[in-house]
Amino acid sequence: MDAFATSPTTALFETVNCNAHVAPMAGEDSSENRPASNYKPSTWDYEFLQSLATTNNTVGEKHTRMADKLKEEVKSMMKGTMEPVAKLELINIVQRLGLKYRFESEIKEELFSLYKDGTDAWWVGNLHATALRFRLLRENGIFVPQDVFETFKDKSGEFKSQLCKDVRGLLSLYEASYLGWEGEELLDEAKKFSTTNLNNVKESISSNTLGRLVKHALNLPLHWSAARYEARWFIDEYEREENVIPNLLKYAKLDFNVVQSIHQKELGNLARWWVETGLDKLGFVRNTLMQNFMWGCAMAFEPQYGKVRDAAVKLGSLITMVDDVYDVYGTLEELEIFTDIVDRWDINGIDKLPRNISMIVLTMFNTANQISYDLLRDRGFNSIPHIAEAWATLCKTYLKEAKWYHSGYKPTLEEYLENGLVSISFVLSLVTAYLQTERLENLTYESAAYVNSVPPLVRYSGLLNRLYNDLGTSSAEIARGDTLKSIQCYMTQTGATEEVAREHIKGLVHEAWKGMNRCLFEQTPLAEPFVGFNVNTVRGSQFFYQHGDGYAVTESWTKDLSLSVLIHPIPLNEED
C-alpha cells in the first residue's frame, strides 16, 4: 500500500509492529558470513540515563525565581548608559555566557543603536574596538564592510608592525576574521596576520586571563564554536576575571542549570525510547544516542526547541544505524531492496530482508510516522511526503557509495563531495527541524520542498559537515580504505600525500565557511531559527571531529564535555 494514498488518520501514521512481515528463517540471514563491525559498546549506563527523566535535580522554585529577578537586572544593565566599547564588551560576555537567547531583542536594539551612531571616534584607530564591533554586528545580521580594517595597514599594504604588541586587539581581529566571505582578501590577510602573531606570543602573555583566552581561541574560534559548549567553558573562565559582574555570573550559572534540567528530562525519555525499540540489542551497529543528544544541543539548545532535539536525536540515532547497514552489514542486494522500500515508503518487500535489518526499517517508518503525526496534530501540516523524500534521498546516496565501494570505482573529489554533502545526513534532520519551527503562515508544500532541494545554505551546511567528518578519519582507516573519504579521493586524484590532502580539505573548510557566512546575509525564503540550525549543526561537527572521530568512538574529550554539559550542574555558592 502506498503511504501517500492513505488517510492521515489510518495507515499514513500507523505504527508498524516490528514483528510484522519479517520472515522467520528465510530472512534470518546469519551474521556469521558478514564483515565484523568492531564497534565498541556504548560507555553510558542506560538505566542511569533513563532515570534522568524522573530524578529531582538541583533547580528548585527558589532558583527559578532568582533567575527571573537576575534576568531583569541584566536587562537593565544592557539598556544602561555606558561607553560604546564597554557596551560591546558586555554584549560579548552575555553571548559567550550562553545568554544571547534570553536577550535577543535587547542585543539587536543596542547593536543597531551603536551602528547608527554617527560618532566613530570611539572605534576608529582602536583595533580591539573596531574588530569587536565588526564581529558582533555581523554575527547579529548587520553588515559591516571589511575596509574598516584598512586604517590598520601601512603604506606598503601590510598590517602595521606595532599591532603585534596589541594582544587584545589581535585576538579580536582573529575572531572577526572568521566572519569573512569569499573574495574578502583583507579579512584573509587579517586571519593570517593575527593567527601568526598570537601563536608567537601565546606562551609569554603576562595576563593569565588573556593568555587562556588566546589559547582557547587558537584551538577553536568563536564563530566555529557551539554556543552551549562554549558557555560551559566560559562560565568558569569568567568567574576568574578581575572585573566579573557577580549578578551576571550568578544568572548565567542559574540559567545553565535550569536549561540542563530540561535537557536531562529529555535525555531520560529518549534513553527509554531507545531501549524500547530493541535496537540496542543489535550488535552490528553503533549506539550513538548520547552523541546525538550532544549534537542536538549544539544545533538547538534553547528550551523552546525540545521537539527539534527529540526528532534530531531519534533520526540521528537511526541514521547512524542505517549508515552502518550500508557501510558494513548489508549485502549489495539487500541494500537495493532497502533503498527501494524507503523510496516507495512502503514496507511491502521487507520479508526479503534479514530480521535485523527489517527491525531498523520498521523503526525508521514508525519514528517518521510518529513525528509526522505530531506535526499534523500540532501544526495541521502533512509532513510525510517531505520526511519520506529526505529519507529516500539519503538512502540513495548511501547506495551510490556502496556501489562505488563494491565495484572498486574511485570517484573524483568533486563527484564524491556532491554525493557526500547529502550522505552526511543532516538534510533529513534539517528538513524535519524546518517543518517543526517555520511560521505556519509560511509553511507550505512548496517551502518544504525548497528545503529538501538542498538550497545554498543547506548545501554549505552539508558540505562542511561532510568535510569535518572526513577530517576525523584516522590514518589507519584511510590506509585500509574501508570507507571512501574525501582525503582518499584527493590522494587518488592528484597523487598527493595524506598530509597534503588533509591540508587541502582544511582549505575547503575555510572556503565553505565563507560561503555560508555570505548566505546568512542573502535574501532567502529561509528564516530564523532554521538558518541558525544550519550553522549550528556544523559547529557540532567541528567539536566531534576536531581531534579525531569523537562520534563513532566516545573519546575522553567528548565524554568529559557531555558530563559537564548534560549531567553535572554548575555548583552554586551557598548564599545562592
From Swiss-Prot:
GO annotation (BP), single: diterpenoid biosynthetic process
Binding site for Mg(2+) 1: 323, 327
Annotated transmembrane regions: none
Keyword Repressor: no
Keyword field contains Ligase: no
Domain of life: Eukaryota
Entry EC no(s): 4.2.3.-
Molecular function per GO: magnesium ion binding; terpene synthase activity
Cofactor notes: Binds 3 Mg(2+) or Mn(2+) ions per subunit.
Entry binding sites for Mg(2+) 3: 469, 473, 477
Record keywords: Lyase, Magnesium, Manganese, Metal-binding
Cofactor: Mg(2+); Mn(2+)
Cystines in this chain: none
Residues that bind (2E,6E)-farnesyl diphosphate: 286, 323, 327, 466, 469
Motif DDXXD motif in this chain: 323-327
One Pfam entry name: Terpene_synth
Residues engaged in binding Mg(2+) 2: 323, 327
Comment on protein domains: The Asp-Asp-Xaa-Xaa-Asp/Glu (DDXXD/E) motif is important for the catalytic activity, presumably through binding to Mg(2+).
Entry's family note: Belongs to the terpene synthase family. Tpsb subfamily.
Function: Produces a mixture of beta-bisabolene and alpha-bisabolol, along with traces of alpha-bisabolene and farnesene isomers from (2E,6E)-farnesyl diphosphate in fragrance biosynthesis.
Protein name: Alpha-bisabolol synthase
